[in-house]
């Protein structure tokens, strides 16, 4: 049996009604690609050395799925993200310091063009750390609860008062000693 694509797993998890169900589903159906996409997307210490956004490519230049495997049938997916995710170190800070920016971008385009369009789309979102924009219900907290060993716990956002200013967290008041 072939592994599910990341887009199938994320779409199904996104359609579940509660965060607890999403966490259980992601744990039961995780693949290396799902785990790595969530870790790279939500880990603030990982910085991609690629330009932000998608390049303006002509459609004849951008042919995801089967670009490396022209003889595969219509049911075959070509390269899968589960296999290709091992190359992520090439695109992050500190991963391969001797790689030039041009070579890094060339390798990125080759990687994206070798994947199924939905997996390539997930990769683009992950690179810009915007996977939660595509899958609205897969939040940082869901990712952390699914893979606590890889995804940092989300930091609490500061609260604002009615005028828009940040409020300080209330500290417990110290009791004065009676004399």
Predicted regions and their residues:
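N-terminal nucleic-acid-engaging modules of covalent nucleotidyltransferase systems
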Residues: 1-179
């Amino acid at each position: 049996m072939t592994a599910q694509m990341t887009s199938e797993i994320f779409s199904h998890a996104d359609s579940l009604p509660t965060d607890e169900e999403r966490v259980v589903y992601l744990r039961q159906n995780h693949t290396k690609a799902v785990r790595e996409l969530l870790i790279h997307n939500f880990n603030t210490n990982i910085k991609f050395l690629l330009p932000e956004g998608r390049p303006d490519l002509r459609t004849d230049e951008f042919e995801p799925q089967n670009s490396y495997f022209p003889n595969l049938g219509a049911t075959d997916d070509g390269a899968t993200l589960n296999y290709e995710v091992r190359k992520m170190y090439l695109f992050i800070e500190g991963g391969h310091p001797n790689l030039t920016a041009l070579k890094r971008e060339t390798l990125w385009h080759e990687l994206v063009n070798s994947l199924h369009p939905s997996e390539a789309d997930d990769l683009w979102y992950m690179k810009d750390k915007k996977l939660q924009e595509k899958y609205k219900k897969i939040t940082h907290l869901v990712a952390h609860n699914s893979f606590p060993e890889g995804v940092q716990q989300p930091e609490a956002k500061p609260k604002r008062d009615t005028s828009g200013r940040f409020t300080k967290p209330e500290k417990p008041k110290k009791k004065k000693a009676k004399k």
